[in-house]
């Protein structure tokens, strides 16, 4: 089984505001590919989710062994701890409110189920090479709406 490592990040200038996402997909021992995109009106959490979704959807075949690194506690806890309860509780959170970004969570859950995924959280802005790359690309995507460079 082919093994991949994915680093993802999302950024938003304002919340809501212009957003960008990025992922680097590393096939062990062979190559790296960076994918990215933007939305004119989004939130940081949507961009974080979209980065992971787009990275996993980029595989043409199911059944990949993937390690996903995210610096988003929202994504990490959502997919590893909260989603099963949300589904069991008809997409209600622990406070009884509707889960935000439900459609994106459903999409992520479905695509992740097609692969063997290990989820890992990485501290942001802590010198991790690939995390820094996706952070820079995501911020650049978000900034492209304002014709300014991110800080």
From Swiss-Prot:
Pfam families: RNase_H. Belongs to the RNase H family. PANTHER family: RIBONUCLEASE H1. This is Ribonuclease H. It catalyses: Endonucleolytic cleavage to 5'-phosphomonoester. Binds 1 Mg(2+) ion per subunit. May bind a second metal ion at a regulatory site, or after substrate binding. Monomer. Mg(2+) 2 binds at residues 9, 135. GO terms for molecular function: magnesium ion binding; nucleic acid binding; RNA-DNA hybrid ribonuclease activity. SUPFAM superfamilies: Ribonuclease H-like. The gene is rnhA. Keywords: Cytoplasm, Endonuclease, Hydrolase, Magnesium, Metal-binding, Nuclease. The keyword Nuclease applies. GO terms for biological process: DNA replication, removal of RNA primer. One of its GO terms (cellular component) is cytoplasm. It comes from Neorickettsia sennetsu (strain ATCC VR-367 / Miyayama) (Ehrlichia sennetsu). The keyword Manganese does not apply. Its cofactor is Mg(2+). It is found in: Cytoplasm. CDD domains: RNase_HI_prokaryote_like. Residues 1-143 form the RNase H type-1 domain. InterPro entries: RNase_H (IPR050092), RNaseH-like_sf (IPR012337), RNaseH_domain (IPR002156), RNaseH_sf (IPR036397), RNaseHI (IPR022892). Its EC number is 3.1.26.4. Its main location: cytoplasm. It is an enzyme of class 3 (hydrolase). Gene3D superfamilies: Ribonuclease H-like superfamily/Ribonuclease H. Endonuclease that specifically degrades the RNA of RNA-DNA hybrids.
């Amino acid at each position: 089984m082919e093994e991949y490592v994915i680093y993802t990040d999302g950024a938003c200038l304002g919340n809501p505001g212009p957003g960008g996402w990025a992922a680097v997909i590393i096939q062990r021992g062979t190559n790296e590919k960076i994918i990215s995109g933007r939305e004119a009106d989004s939130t940081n959490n949507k961009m974080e989710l979209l980065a992971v979704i787009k990275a996993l959807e980029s595989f043409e075949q199911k059944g990949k062994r993937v390690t996903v690194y995210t610096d988003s506690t929202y994504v990490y806890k959502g997919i590893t701890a909260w989603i099963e309860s949300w589904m069991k509780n008809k997409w209600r959170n622990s406070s009884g409110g509707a889960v935000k970004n439900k459609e994106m969570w459903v999409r992520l859950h479905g695509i992740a189920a097609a692969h063997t995924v290990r989820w890992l959280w990485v501290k942001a802005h802590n010198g991790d090479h690939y995390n820094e790359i996706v952070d820079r690309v995501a911020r650049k995507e978000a900034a492209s709406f304002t014709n300014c460079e991110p800080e």
